[in-house]
Every structure is written in structure tokens, then in C-alpha cells.
């Protein structure tokens, strides 16, 4: 398992299923499954941080 706090950028494959939060402001959280492509937020490429396991 990847540790809580792992980061992934828009366009990368999600390294761990769980709840991911956008780093910065504005922010949001989203459940993203391992292997899915990390999505953009508000039309921009962002960095996501794992905050909770699925």
C-alpha cells in the first residue's frame, strides 16, 4: 500500500484506491480507484494527495 500523504498529478495513474484531496486552493476531495487516471480539477492540472484509504 502507498502511504497516506502520497501525491499524484493529473494524468498519472492512481497509485492507491482511496480519498484524494487537491493540494492548494480551491480544493476538493474525491474517491479515486487505483489504476484510474488522476483527474483535473476546475479545468486545470493539479496535484492530488491521498488522505484516506478506500
Language model segments and positions:
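A charge-rich, low-complexity, intrinsically flexible signal that marks solvent-exposed coils, linkers
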Residues: 1-54
Amino acid at each position: 500500500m502507498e502511504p497516506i500523504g502520497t501525491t499524484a498529478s493529473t494524468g498519472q495513474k492512481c497509485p492507491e484506491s482511496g480519498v484524494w484531496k487537491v493540494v492548494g486552493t480551491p480544493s476538493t476531495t474525491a474517491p479515486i480507484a487505483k489504476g484510474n487516471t488522476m483527474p483535473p480539477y476546475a479545468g486545470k492540472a493539479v496535484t492530488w494527495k491521498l488522505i484516506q484509504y478506500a
